[in-house]
From Swiss-Prot:
It comes from Arabidopsis thaliana. GO terms for molecular function: UDP-glucuronate 4-epimerase activity. Its EC number is 5.1.3.6. This is UDP-glucuronate 4-epimerase 6. It comes from the Eukaryota. GO terms for biological process: defense response to fungus; defense response to Gram-negative bacterium; galacturonate biosynthetic process. It holds the Pfam family Epimerase. The chain crosses the membrane at residues 41-61, 111-131. It catalyses: UDP-alpha-D-glucuronate = UDP-alpha-D-galacturonate. One of its GO terms (cellular component) is Golgi cisterna membrane. Optimum pH is 7.9. Active from pH 6 to 8.9.
Length: 460
């Protein structure tokens, strides 16, 4: 074989080997690239699955409030604004928007358009009915959690629906839902009454108080500051902010830096947050410090309510005494008086001064006590209930726990009287008579309640 032919063959073999080597390198790069793409795709799918799981399942916790929040979030995401369904009856649909507008539209000239959060609650339902009765537009908002019997909240909802007040079911931390409501309705006012209530429960489930009373409040303020126009906001603080204050009666200028419970601390935090949003964004904000509200359609976790239940069922009731063996006293305030205070605050609330999330001028910032001004020992409350129910209570006197509660409350309401004419008119005996009448009727109990014998009490 000629030398030239041998050389050509050798070159050909080397070239083929080189090309083979290049093909191997290319294949390896393709494989590596494919692996990276596959890994990223797998990671993306995993993240999507985690998101779906988080939306559709409540946390592995015994927190009832947290579970309720996740359930309502799931309901909104699956049937509401982000749903592919075209059903007009779902949240965000045409029929839903029509109900929202109709409920929010005032029936009187220059009437208010009010978003009432916690509308299925005790104070919220009464305020919603009062506003509707005088011709204001009212849209309710509530998450119907199970802190106490949800069937009572549903019964209040039925009362409101009979007066054409629609309640949107949702959570305060659901920003898209709140923004949707403000897209549909230019609310003039917000009456913010939604909150996680209860002093003792805060020791068992502190997270629910942070989620509702702080995070939920901030979320509502964030939506309100961006609204056009910005609404004026009246919201429920609490007499509990006075905490370990020893000055008597409690006045708005007294110190509130010693909360005795987490519930009180969240309400105090709310007052500071309100100041911040007023200062930075020009939101008009009025805080109302309620003092032990009672009356028909009340909360089952309140002493007067479960005392009534236990007395009728022959169960023993615990009556607290202070550590130095004094009677515990509360400034019990009848619901109708609280409603008058809420409406008065709404009527005197000035417009917010912000626009597009920016402050344009000084805005109104207020805080008021709403109480009865007449503290009554808890033992006296029990005696009144015994007389109304015709049954002696089985009393168990115990020392009040050192942590979480306070021995007495006493409201000075002179500022609320001065600014919007707030004046409580219902004493405890008259108010409890109205509550007991409602209680035996609502729960279908054979009436053993004594008839009214005092014209003075009847007209109180």
């Amino acid at each position: 074989m000629p030398l030239s032919a041998t050389a050509d063959t050798s070159k050909t073999v080397k070239l083929e080997r080189y090309n083979s080597y290049l093909r191997k390198i290319h294949s390896t790069k393709v494989l590596n690239a494919s692996s990276k793409v596959l890994f990223r795709a797998t990671l993306l799918v995993a993240l999507v699955l985690v998101l779906i799981f988080a939306i559709n399942y409540p946390p592995l916790s015994d927190s009832r409030a947290a579970a309720a929040h996740h359930l309502h979030r799931r309901s909104f995401l699956s049937t509401g604004l982000f749903s592919s369904s075209s059903s007009s009856s779902s949240i965000g649909g045409a029929a839903w928007e029509k109900r929202v507008r109709q409920s929010s539209t005032a029936k009187r000239p220059h009437g208010l358009s009010v978003l009432v959060t916690g509308a299925a609650g005790f104070v919220g339902s009464h305020c919603s009915l009062a506003l509707r009765k005088r011709g204001d537009g009212v849209l309710g908002f509530d998450n119907f959690n199970d802190y106490y019997d949800p069937s009572l909240k549903r019964a209040r909802q039925e009362l409101l629906e009979k007066q054409q007040v629609f309640i949107v079911e949702g959570d305060l931390n659901d920003g898209p839902l709140l923004r949707k409501l403000f897209d549909v309705v230019p609310f003039t006012h917000i009456l913010h009454l939604a909150a996680q209530a209860g002093v003792r429960y805060a020791m068992k489930n502190p997270q629910s108080y942070i989620a509702s009373n702080i995070a939920g409040f901030v979320n509502l303020l964030e939506v309100a500051k961006a609204a056009n126009p910005q609404p004026a906001i009246v919201w429920a603080s609490s007499s509990s902010v006075y905490g370990l204050n020893t000055e008597n009666p409690f006045s708005e200028e007294h110190r509130t830096d010693q909360p005795a419970s987490l519930y009180a601390a969240t309400k105090k935090a709310g007052e500071e947050i309100a100041h911040t949003y007023n200062h930075i964004y020009g939101l008009s904000l009025t805080g109302l410090r309620f003092f032990t509200v009672y009356g028909p359609w009340g909360r089952p976790d309140m002493a007067y309510f479960f005392f009534t239940k236990d007395i009728l069922h022959g169960k023993s009731i615990d009556i607290y005494r202070t550590q130095d063996n004094q009677e515990v006293a509360r400034d019990f305030t009848y619901i109708d008086d609280i409603v008058k205070g809420c409406v008065g605050a709404l009527d005197t609330a000035e417009k917010s001064t912000g626009s597009g999330g920016k402050k344009r001028g000084q805005a109104q910032l207020r805080v008021y006590n709403l109480g009865n001004t007449s503290p009554v020992p808890v033992g006296r409350l029990v005696s009144i209930l015994e007389g109304l129910l015709g049954t002696k209570a089985k009393k168990h006197l115990i020392k009040m726990p050192r942590n979480g509660d306070v021995p007495y409350t006493h409201a000075n309401v002179s500022l609320a009287y001065k600014d919007f004419g707030y004046k409580p008119t219902t004493d405890l005996a008259a108010g409890l008579r109205k509550f007991v009448k409602w209680y035996v009727g609502y729960y279908g109990i054979q009436p053993r309640v004594k008839k009214e014998t005092s014209h003075a009490e009847d007209s109180a």
